[in-house]
């Protein structure tokens, strides 16, 4: 069990770049299909109306988030690393590291879709039982920590940086990814 957990924690660094890209694409498409099926993303930002959007829009949003996550990290990797690294390796490893975020939809699959939808629309979450909110907050925070850790492991493998310098550069790249993703999603919503 200890070996399994150890392998799972360092998986973004030990998996081959091609496998990381293929698994990442599988989870990206699977997450887009699940998100489309559950229709948990608001179709209107203003009044939180819920409904179905086209499947392709979920795939486009997923790809936009993936690209906006990988571009700043690619820039930092190119600046730090002395030898060249393939663009598809950076995109593949960062897409693989994004897999834990897909698990946010699991409670909708196995639980109450209405409570899950209300939790995701934060202005409506005050109507939920406190135990459900605490469980979901813990669950979401654990997945985000897992995502950031896997991203750091993949980043450290690509840049060959460990310690505080690696953490600081990864933090800067993630902040750049956040800003870029906010811009990209904002542009997609306006289209």
What do these predicted ranges mean?
Residues 48-115:
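Alpha-helical transmembrane segments with an aromatic anchor "belt"
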Residues 24-32, 58-71, 94, 98, ...:
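Alpha-helical transmembrane spans of integral membrane proteins, capturing the lipid-embedded, hydrophobic core
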Residues 13-18, 79-89, 156-165:
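Membrane-interface helix-boundary motifs at transmembrane edges
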Residues 178-191:
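Juxtamembrane boundary at the C-terminal end of a transmembrane helix
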Residues 151-175:
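Interfacial loop-to-transmembrane junctions
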């Amino acid at each position: 069990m200890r070996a399994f957990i150890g392998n799972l924690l360092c998986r973004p660094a030990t998996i081959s770049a091609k496998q990381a890209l293929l698994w990442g694409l599988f989870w990206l498409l699977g997450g887009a299909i699940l998100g489309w099926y559950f229709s948990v993303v608001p179709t209107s930002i203003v009044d939180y109306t819920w409904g179905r959007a086209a499947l392709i829009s979920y795939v486009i949003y997923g790809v936009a988030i993936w690209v906006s996550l990988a571009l700043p990290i690619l820039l930092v990797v190119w600046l730090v690393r002395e030898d060249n690294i393939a663009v598809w390796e950076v995109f593949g490893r960062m897409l693989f590291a994004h897999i834990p975020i897909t698990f946010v939809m699991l409670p909708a699959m196995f639980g109450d879709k209405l409570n899950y939808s209300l939790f995701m629309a934060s202005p409506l979450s005050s109507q939920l039982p406190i135990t459900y909110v605490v469980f979901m907050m813990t669950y979401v925070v654990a997945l985000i920590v897992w995502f950031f850790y896997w991203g750091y492991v993949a980043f450290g493998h690509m840049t060959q940086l460990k310690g505080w310098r690696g953490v600081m550069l990864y933090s800067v790249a993630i902040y750049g990814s956040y800003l870029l993703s906010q811009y990209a999603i904002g542009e997609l919503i306006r289209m």
